[in-house]
């Protein structure tokens, strides 16, 4: 029986082992026509079919601080101010606003997904996470904080 335990363990748990592939297939996830709420003025924001760099973050996320600076620079230096959207994910709205007051506002769209519906539909694992949306479809996911190499890839490969 001792010799069969490792085999039994593999049979039971092997199907649950998967890897995360950030390159999506032709079955890309569509996210158009979602409504979010602005963190700035509480107005409705519609996620449409345009090009969007959609970043999920939270005020308690230490990696999100550095990434926030990168996204501000990306938006301001590459004329993408209407294309970068930071979505506060499973966080207290007041804490999110305090984060922005502490670390600055950029030429970025700041939103909250109050019901987490968009995050659930698009398969968010956690924060930070960034999705590249082209024509209403997520075509690339960056799980974890963005780095300069990721930023360069975004600038060179997407509209």
Predicted regions: what they are:
Residues 2-10:
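Sec-dependent signal peptide recognition
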Residues 11-18:
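Hydrophobic h-region of N-terminal signal peptides that target proteins for export
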Residues 18-45:
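N-terminal "domain-start" segment that seeds a small globular fold
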Residues 44-65:
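Short active-site neighborhood of thiol/selenol oxidoreductases, capturing the structured segment around
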Residues 53-54, 84, 130:
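Hydrophobic beta-strand anchors of alpha/beta hydrolase catalytic cores
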Residues 66-103, 114-120:
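Structural microenvironment flanking redox-active thiols in thiol-disulfide oxidoreductases
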Residues 82, 108-109:
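Short, conserved active-site loop motifs that form the nucleotide-linked donor/cofactor pocket
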